[in-house]
Every structure is written in structure tokens, then in C-alpha cells.
Amino acid sequence: MGEKITLKITKREVLGKKVKTLRRQGITPGVVYGAGMEAVPIQAEAGEVLRVYKLAGKHTPVQLLGSERRIAMIKDVEPYPTRSNALRHISFHAVRADEPVIAEVPIRLSGTGESEAERAGLVVLQALEKIKVKALPMDLPEALEAPTDGLVKEGDRV
């Protein structure tokens, strides 16, 4: 896994429909929950939340820096229906660093160029985009590599 992804958060006092005022100020509301803890409403700067979501997705742990440090996985996001550059809400699931988690990790096709099958005019199709992986949060891979160099003829699989 690459470098640690961090997000500065603060506890959110504004609740309910009043969060519209936060959004207008460039703040994204959210929540952190997990086993053995009460759900905690949080907030963070909207640009940072979007950056973290683009980097981490739902398969990379994020270090939440607030009054307490927590490791969490992004569980759910609510995007704006009309804007692609902002999130209305984000939910984090707090995890323990010493307990395995299950996450869907993307599969990337890799190789040193075109496979023999592609040079023969065949098309390489990727049937799975993601696969479930069980690991400690800080050991989760960014992606799993599927080498295509060994594809030679029709029907070959990775």
C-alpha cells in the first residue's frame, strides 16, 4: 500500500436540515460509526473530503485526525445529483488496526504491452472489475494485478 491517507475532521454540532449552511460554507457533513462506539457526526472541508474519496475509494483505510485518531474505511458517499466535484455526505466505518476487514479491491490488467492473443487480433475482456479481499486494514492492496502476458489463444484466462 502507498502512503497513508489522512483527513482532518471535527465533531459536527449542526444537525438535521441545518447542515445546508455547512455545505454553503464549503464543509461536507459526515458520520463515523463502528463496533463498540456511538455514531459520531463529523464535518470536514469539502475539497479535502473529495480528494480523500478519490484517493482512497471504498477499499483503502483513511486516518481520521480529530480529537481522537481513528482508522476508518469509507462506507458510503452521497454525491450531488448535478455536480461531480462535490459530495453531500460521507460515512466512515471505524476499524481496528489489529482486526482483518473485508474490502472490494479493484483488479488491474497488467503486462509488458500487447499479449500474444491481442497481436493475433483477439480482444481481451475483463470479466471482474473488483474482488473481495480479507486483510488487516493497513495491509489492504490498492489493487490486484492480473498479468495478461500469458494470454495466447482464444479461451485463455488469467
PLM regions: where:
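Extended basic (Lys/Arg/His-rich) segments that typically form rRNA-contacting surfaces
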Residues: M1-R157
